[in-house]
């Protein structure tokens, strides 16, 4: 995960100090790209312990098309609690847009199902895209999509994915986002009979919150460990039938966790 640490160091040392929506203050750069060869290991940060359970359950929750945190809480995942209302609702966020993008005629588009069908039918398409950035629905979202748009690419029997993340909380959010989309790429590759290729992460506003600087310096002083491997124990009938128990991260060794406050 050296590319991730390089981004963190670059922003910490050369970023521009700016105000932000949360009132916390950030140091940021605009525009950065990282590439991870998924054949070489699963891109999970090792310079601090990452909560794998939250990553897996959140992705399964997105794939359900869910927008209420109840199911996450039932499974011990609280990463969305700060944004949910009293009933646990978040509005038409990621899962809704992925699975039920509304059309002017009142119908809904299942972007994930259509994506997989397109990969199988026309793998050379340049339209293998899923978007969560629905401008009409943003006012009703508790938090507009940070990881907003992703595209797949098939070459030499391998499936690659590129994510565009408009807003990137480097210390807390980005390790989750990298692992989540790497996991999704593995799942879709399995469903479409392909091997995995690269995961490409592209960031817009890449920032460190001012109250994370001490934690950043601690993390940058640590030496990365070898990447783990992902093992998917079975192939379900569809992308929507995976369970938490289907995934095993093999050989994950990390430095201790580093706690930091979330900017809401």
From Swiss-Prot:
The keyword Cell inner membrane does not apply. It is an enzyme of class 2 (transferase). DUMP binds at residues 21, 126-127, 166-169, 177, 207-209. The keyword DNA repair does not apply. Pathway: Pyrimidine metabolism; dTTP biosynthesis. The active site is at 146 (nucleophile). It comes from the Bacteria. It holds the Pfam family Thymidylat_synt. Keywords: Cytoplasm, Methyltransferase, Nucleotide biosynthesis, Transferase. GO terms for cellular component: cytosol. GO terms for biological process: dTMP biosynthetic process; dTTP biosynthetic process; methylation. Its EC number is 2.1.1.45. It is found in: Cytoplasm. HAMAP family: Thymidy_synth_bact. PANTHER family: THYMIDYLATE SYNTHASE, THYMIDYLATE SYNTHASE 1. Belongs to the thymidylate synthase family. Bacterial-type ThyA subfamily. Homodimer. Catalyzes the reductive methylation of 2'-deoxyuridine-5'-monophosphate (dUMP) to 2'-deoxythymidine-5'-monophosphate (dTMP) while utilizing 5,10-methylenetetrahydrofolate (mTHF) as the methyl donor and reductant in the reaction, yielding dihydrofolate (DHF) as a by-product. This enzymatic reaction provides an intracellular de novo source of dTMP, an essential precursor for DNA biosynthesis. This is Thymidylate synthase. It comes from Ralstonia nicotianae (strain ATCC BAA-1114 / GMI1000).
